[in-house]
């Protein structure tokens, strides 16, 4: 009997299956994701593209790390500043970090330069919202969802305008606005605030300090997000704040995981995906050859992140001197001028496959600035760390690694060559650091689904179901008084006081009656006796 009588041939089945996959594919808009977060999410976007989804990335002509890609569509829009302007501002910011002088002097210089960078970012957002041609394209493209980093809330404003369900991809908002907007409990008694340099085990005065940071964070949020609230109100043509818009997020993909971060409450739509960037590939041949030639001593990986292009020569020479005191071969990612005392065991490279090197069994230590991207790579690959935090959440990340016994933290301004050498030798030679980071790595990897797959799943989930309203807590519909049950407490207190008052009055009345009756009885008895 002819095969065609029983059903379609295999090629036809494959064609039908491929068409079914295309029918299920969605369209994702990505915006306001640059810098280190871009490196963390890029692999997830590649995976979404491989699954048949169309990915459109909206990015300004001037960006930090986003380049062209074959896997997704890049839509660029003009901005009123150049790449050189942005690069110079970032370089100046990091130069100030390394400069000497008093704390206040460095603080005000840093704030002044940070404002320049911030103005560039706000201006970029304004140009996007005012680009009528691009906005029209986005309106007509019928996206299923938007993926954005809410730290730069331009994507959040776009999501509201386009009526799109949003997936937030972030490490955290420094002033705690993420937890406030999501109605997530954030008790200061055991949840350390950003930049507080505290752990979850706090003394009384540390808890006082932690609570005071909440007051500081209120001003920080107002200062940082007021320009975006103004932009949003003008663009959406109604009075609105960034916090109002953030409340509409469908899913929060948090670049955190409780192996590193301290246990704390999360809402049902908050998904920890720390370590999503840990998949590694084979080393390029030129790196593999150097690693194999390192012998029994192995290698050390050193990188202060993609944004630090150079450091002052004096500091670079101190670092070079320290690196020469260990027998390991050191890969140092550095694009500045090579220090004249660079030892033979140090290989300066403009780029290195960081995660692939950390995954190599010959890697003995990782010197890092403490960015969450690199820290999770260190944990995934069980490499003890020497941390030199520069700014932002890096101080908090370093504190967490050190409190777990998986590394040592150095003050990059005050550290000497001897400090660097001693810290590096300690994490290499003292077995406790390797044992502790190995334990963290085992805990982190012992999970039913890889963080990257989990992140991709939730993006697809939001695209398929047009959001996740079933995960939205009713707390969003309550005011402050209702949320804290102050009205209920007041009602119960009033009922209790009223009951006590009535009981008191009843007792008083009974006592008076009893006393009066007793008085009359006494008088009657006296009258009879006479």
Model-inferred region functions:
Residues 2-234, 243, 260, 274-281, ...:
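Glycosyltransferase specificity loop/lid
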Residues 240:
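Conserved, non-catalytic sequence blocks in retroelement Pol enzymes and Pol-derived host proteins
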């Amino acid at each position: 009997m002819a095969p065609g009588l029983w059903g379609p041939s295999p090629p036809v089945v494959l064609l039908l299956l491929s068409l079914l996959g295309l029918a299920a594919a969605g369209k994702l808009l990505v915006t306001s994701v640059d810098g280190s977060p871009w490196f963390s999410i890029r692999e997830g976007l590649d995976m979404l593209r491989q699954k048949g989804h169309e990915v459109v990335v909206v990015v300004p002509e001037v960006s930090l790390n986003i380049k062209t890609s074959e896997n997704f569509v890049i839509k660029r829009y003009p901005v009123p500043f150049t790449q050189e302007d942005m690069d110079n501002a970032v370089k100046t910011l990091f130069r100030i970090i390394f400069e000497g002088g008093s704390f206040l002097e460095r603080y005000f210089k840093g704030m002044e330069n940070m404002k320049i960078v911030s103005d560039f970012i706000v201006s970029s957002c304004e140009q996007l919202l005012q680009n009528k041609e691009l906005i029209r394209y986005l309106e007509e493209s019928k996206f299923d969802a938007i993926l954005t980093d809410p730290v730069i809330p331009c994507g959040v404003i776009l999501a509201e305008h386009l009526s799109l369900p949003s997936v937030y991809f972030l490490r955290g908002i420094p002033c705690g606005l993420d937890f406030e907007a999501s109605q997530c409990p954030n008790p200061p008694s055991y949840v350390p605030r950003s930049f507080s340099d505290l752990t979850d085990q706090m003394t009384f005065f540390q808890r006082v300090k932690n609570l005071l940071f909440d007051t500081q964070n209120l001003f920080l949020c107002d200062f940082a997000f007021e320009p975006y609230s103004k932009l949003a109100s003008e663009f959406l043509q109604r009075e609105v704040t960034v916090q109002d818009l953030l409340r509409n997020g469908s899913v929060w993909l948090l670049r955190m995981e409780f192996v590193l971060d301290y246990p704390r409450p999360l809402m049902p739509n908050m998904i920890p995906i720390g370590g999503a960037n840990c998949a590694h590939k084979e080393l390029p041949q030129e790196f593999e050859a150097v690693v194999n030639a390192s012998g029994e001593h192995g290698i050390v990986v050193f990188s202060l992140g993609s944004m630090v292009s150079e450091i002052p020569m004096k500091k670079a020479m101190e670092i070079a001197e320290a690196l020469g005191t260990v027998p390991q071969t050191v890969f140092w990612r550095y694009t500045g001028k090579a220090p004249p005392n660079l030892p033979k065991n140090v290989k300066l490279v403009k780029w290195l496959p960081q995660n692939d090197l950390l995954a190599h069994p010959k890697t003995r230590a990782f010197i890092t600035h403490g960015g969450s991207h690199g820290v999770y790579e260190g944990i995934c690959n069980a490499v003890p760390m020497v941390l030199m935090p520069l700014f932002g959440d890096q101080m908090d990340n370093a504190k967490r690694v050190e409190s777990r016994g998986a590394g040592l933290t150095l003050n990059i301004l005050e550290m000497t060559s001897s400090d660097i050498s001693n810290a590096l030798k300690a994490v290499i030679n003292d077995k406790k650091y390797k044992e502790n980071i190995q334990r963290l790595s085992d805990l982190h990897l012992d999970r039913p689904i890889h963080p990257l797959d989990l992140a991709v799943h939730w993006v697809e989930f939001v695209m398929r179901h047009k959001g996740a309203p079933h995960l939205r807590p009713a707390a969003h519909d309550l005011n402050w008084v209702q949320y804290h049950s102050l009205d209920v407490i007041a009602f119960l207190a009033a009922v209790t006081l009223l009951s006590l008052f009535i009981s008191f009055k009843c007792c008083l009345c009974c006592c008076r009656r009893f006393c009066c009756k007793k008085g009359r009885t006494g008088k009657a008895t006296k009258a009879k006796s006479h």
